[in-house]
Swiss-Prot record:
GO biological process: heme biosynthetic process
GO cellular component: cytoplasm
Gene: hemH
InterPro entries noted in UniProt: Ferrochelatase, Ferrochelatase_AS, Ferrochelatase_C, Ferrochelatase_N
Protein name per Swiss-Prot or TrEMBL: Ferrochelatase
CDD domains for the chain: Ferrochelatase_C, Ferrochelatase_N
GO MF, any single term: metal ion binding
Length: 354
């Protein structure tokens, strides 16, 4: 009862000219699918010490001498395959999400979108919220599973540009019931037209050293199999969070352990990344005789290059070459009505933290 009274008081304060600002953060996207635009984006993205976490001189050499002379041309061609008439899918769907969350929350809230890299920047989004005379700030990075290279980097940028005295952060929601329910509903909607032999949950990968820096004890972690359920010993482990999300969704779908698996995509460079790798997992599934595969990407709430091209085109092509019949990619949550409501509920719940 005390918590509910506090919440009512908070909402009453909002109505008395204390508007709440909500900052949704996504990773970012090039302005256009051209080589110069992709080069600008990659330069900013890969120069982040939380992304390529090596000494600054070594990072400069890697980015400017090993990546930027070659990768922008290849990446631009990939972006061209998924670019929408309205622009980048990541930006189009993120803006749609921002707009609908704002409509759902109502006039007492102001919702802005900021990208960690590219436009609109986090700084620009914060200025919009300040101009709207918001008094308090709720920050929600759209990364369900916490990692230093996404969530921590975004929050570091917020703190560097922020002038709000009252701020609360939703830094992860990998096991948030509203998020899990939204994912489950989305999958159920697609099961009406496609019945798979197997479900694959594919997450963005990370270098293993990032897990070590987050406190994950790899020496006692059975990395080849499912991570242990979340506890105080692995609560900051990105890989463990991914497995926990998968377990929760699978439970809602009444899947057995033999009906689904977890893998990690988008690896870059020669360093050891967390396993199993999605492309290699597809090979193993084909050897087991799986023909109809449904792929879900829970770490990407908004469709982007990694979902639409890497899975929707490249993995689809690989699956057919391996003899598979169908690879069905479940679209990201994007601006799904249940997901919009889920974000609104998480934002209102976070008011108790002020």
């Amino acid at each position: 009862m005390a918590k509910q009274a506090i919440k009512r008081a908070k909402i009453l304060a909002v109505k008395n000219n204390n508007k709440i600002g909500v900052l949704l953060i996504n990773l970012g996207t090039p302005d256009e699918p051209s080589v110069p635009a992709v080069r600008r984006y990659l330069r900013q993205f890969l120069s982040d010490p939380k992304v390529i976490d090596v000494p600054s001189l070594m990072r400069w050499i890697i980015v400017h001498l090993c990546i930027l002379p070659f990768r922008p041309k290849r990446s631009a061609k990939l972006y061209q395959k998924i670019w929408m008439p309205e622009g980048s899918p990541l930006l189009v769907y993120s803006e749609m999400l921002r707009e609908r969350v704002g409509e759902t929350l109502g006039d007492d809230f102001c919702v802005a979108l900021g990208m960690r890299y590219g436009k609109p920047s986090i700084e620009t989004a914060l200025k919009k919220l300040q101009e709207a005379q918001c008094r308090q700030l709720i920050v929600l990075p759209l990364f369900p599973q916490y990692s230093t290279s996404t969530t921590a980097s975004a929050l570091e940028e917020v703190r560097a540009k922020n002038s709000f005295k009252e701020m609360t952060v939703i830094d992860r929601f990998f096991e948030e019931p509203h998020y899990i329910d939204s994912m489950t509903t989305l999958i159920h909607e697609n099961l009406n037209e496609f019945q798979p032999d197997y479900f694959l949950f594919s997450y963005h990968g990370l270098p293993e050293r990032h897990l070590v820096k987050s406190g994950c004890q790899l020496a006692i972690c059975n990395r080849k199999n499912n991570c242990s359920p979340i506890s105080s010993s692995n609560e900051n482990c990105y890989r463990a969070q991914c497995f926990e999300t998968s377990r929760l969704i699978a439970k809602k779908l009444n899947l057995t352990d033999q009906q689904y698996g977890v893998a990690f995509q988008s690896r870059l460079g020669r360093a050891k990344w967390i396993e199993p790798y999605t492309d290699k997992y597809l090979i193993e599934l084909s050897k087991k005789g799986i023909k109809k595969l449904m792929v879900v990407c829970p770490s990407f709430p908004v469709d982007c290059l990694e979902t639409l091209e890497e899975i929707g085109i490249r993995a689809q092509s690989q699956w057919q070459r391996l003899g598979g019949e169908t690879l069905k990619l479940i679209p990201s949550l994007n601006a799904h009505p249940q997901w919009v409501n889920a974000i609104a509920k998480m934002a209102k719940k976070s008011l108790q933290l002020f």
